[in-house]
């Protein structure tokens, strides 16, 4: 640690904040180096503000209600037991890593398809959206297979009980099975549809999937029927299929 004091969990929190601030500063610096000085104005006109809000508000609400849904799921895990919550937390890092590895396709879809639509090249936009979905499917299948193969080695990296490792390994299998569906939703909903301005449509899909299917299933299976955590995770994740 190069002579620095051991901070434990607080140190991890400090490191996260510092890394995020550093990343933001680097992005701002690169932006100004590429484009020089820019003139910032918030005067969009009446029609501009209206259109901006119509596009932005559904995105904000969608992310807000999705985050609230994830909080409810965590609440369910916590009330099922310490091992269950620890097992789910164990998989968080690798889930974020694998989804993050393919999130670039969603961002690329938003840029590429948006550019084609802006140029009125609708046929090319459709063809390229299919190609991006295909790449996402292939990539997610490969990562799913790798994740299933190394799941036991991954959980062995943590100093936890055998029960927690068992739960974590099983949850990773379920996540790997559902990953292709998650990635397709990410590319189509988060990239293709939003690039076409269908933000309200995406918001409705996300809210219905989360609050009409995912959250009720999590509450029923986890708190009422008291099913094992692996089955709870598998059942409420079927919201991805509905989306």
Give the residues covered by each predicted segment.
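Hydrophobic faces of transmembrane alpha-helices in multi-pass small-molecule transporters and flippases
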Residues: 17, 26-29, 44-72, 76, ...
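Transmembrane alpha-helix boundary and packing residues in multipass membrane permease domains
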Residues: 16, 29, 59, 63, ...
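Membrane-helix interface segments
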Residues: 8, 83-84, 199-200, 228-229
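Helix-terminus/linker motif at the lipid-water interface of multi-pass membrane proteins
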Residues: 1-7, 60, 64-97, 115-116, ...
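Short alpha-helical transmembrane segments in multi-pass integral membrane proteins
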Residues: 4-57, 113-178, 221-243
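Small-residue-enriched core segments of transmembrane alpha-helices in multipass membrane transport
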Residues: 93, 207-216
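Small-residue-rich hydrophobic transmembrane alpha-helices
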Residues: 74, 85-151, 183-202
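Transmembrane alpha-helical segments of integral membrane proteins
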Residues: 1, 185-189, 213-222
């Amino acid at each position: 640690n190069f002579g620095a004091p051991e901070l434990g969990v607080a140190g991890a929190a400090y490191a996260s904040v510092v890394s995020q601030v550093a990343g933001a500063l680097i992005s701002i610096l690169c932006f100004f180096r590429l484009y020089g000085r820019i003139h910032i104005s918030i005067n969009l006109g009446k029609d501009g503000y209206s259109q901006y809000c119509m596009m932005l508000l559904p995105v904000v609400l969608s992310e807000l209600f999705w985050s609230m849904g994830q909080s409810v799921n965590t609440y369910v895990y916590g009330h099922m037991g310490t091992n269950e919550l620890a097992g789910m937390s164990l998989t968080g890092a690798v889930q974020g890593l694998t989804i993050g590895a393919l999130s670039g396709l969603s961002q690329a879809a938003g840029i590429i398809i948006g550019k084609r639509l802006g140029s009125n090249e609708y046929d090319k936009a459709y063809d390229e959206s299919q190609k991006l979905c295909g790449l996402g499917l292939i990539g997610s299948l490969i990562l799913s297979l790798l994740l299933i193969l190394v799941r036991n080695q991954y959980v062995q990296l943590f100093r936890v009980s055998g029960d927690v490792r068992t739960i974590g390994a099983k949850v990773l299998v379920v996540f790997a099975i559902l990953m292709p569906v998650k990635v397709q939703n990410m590319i189509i909903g988060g990239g293709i549809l939003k690039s076409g301005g269908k933000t309200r449509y995406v918001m409705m899909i996300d809210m219905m999937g989360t609050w009409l299917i995912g959250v009720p299933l999590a509450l029923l299976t986890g708190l009422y029927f008291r099913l094992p955590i692996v089955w709870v995770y598998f059942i409420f994740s079927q919201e991805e299929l509905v989306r």
